[in-house]
């Protein structure tokens, strides 16, 4: 082995150990659950996820696909994969928490996440300042290797109105994803149109940084305000029911072509953009607490008339539902997709 190859191998081993220690400090309970199913130890688990071909100078970032407070997502190489990189070393444990959630979900799905309408996860790579200039010299952070999608549901509704057939496809996909999360005992905690990715005509849930396994200690509340269920406004924790509520708001945005409560807020403030003032936030919290998002978002009779069946279907997302509700909704949305295929 050449001196350069030996040096790279040593760096890789050091990064594997570093990431394993981060996982043990941040998520010991969830890590133990994942390791029990994988029948391995922390370092062997990280090594099993390692994507050497996209780590430590073996890959290049081509363009930014999206950026948030925790991470930026870059297109990789030929565009088949995307890399989610923490914005700083301090944010790295948050992404490793997401790695564990993805691992848990992949175990539940037998590795076939796409079939359950969750963005496929392909492992972990190491990123240094040489690849990502926002990092400090000598820092190495974990990055998630994900399947690259075409766009977000937010971009879809901003670009053009969707057909009824396509709306029912998105509804079916989101209900299928919600059902899978419930079966896997995972609460997403931050479902919104920006976190629903689209490839072709299909939708997939992404961004599990706020997610939690049901019987684990609750994560800090980071749900986007516009997508909060009324119970979260009063200090409650995210649940499967609040995930369903947020998914309903995503589907409502496809009908109105506005993010939740945005159109009414613009009319109220005579502004074309949200003000983010304290007064605006208080107004938004009051509107959410009413528990009637259809009333506060569908502001024209024409929309009510054109989307009557879909709005009737959506009302169920905003009230307490029976345990078997998702199965029934999935069957109904599948039937509607079939109807619109002809």
UniProtKB/Swiss-Prot annotation:
Keyword ATP-binding annotated: yes
UniProt keyword annotations, A-Z: ATP-binding, Kinase, Nucleotide-binding, Serine/threonine-protein kinase, Transferase
Enzyme Commission number(s) of this protein: 2.7.11.1
Catalytic activity: L-seryl-[protein] + ATP = O-phospho-L-seryl-[protein] + ADP + H(+); L-threonyl-[protein] + ATP = O-phospho-L-threonyl-[protein] + ADP + H(+)
InterPro entries with a match to the protein in the record: Kinase-like_dom_sf, Prot_kinase_dom, Ser/Thr_kinase_AS, Ser_Thr_kinase
GO terms, molecular function: ATP binding; protein serine kinase activity; protein serine/threonine kinase activity
Binding site for ATP: 65-73, 84
Residue intervals of the Protein kinase domain: 59-342
Catalytic class of the enzyme: transferase
Stored SUPFAM superfamilies: Protein kinase-like (PK-like)
Active site, per annotation: 190 (proton acceptor)
Function in brief: Probable serine/threonine protein kinase which may function redundantly with MPK1-independent branch of the PCK1 pathway.
Family, per entry: Belongs to the protein kinase superfamily. Ser/Thr protein kinase family.
Protein name (record): Serine/threonine-protein kinase ISR1
Organism: Eremothecium gossypii (strain ATCC 10895 / CBS 109.51 / FGSC 9923 / NRRL Y-1056) (Yeast)
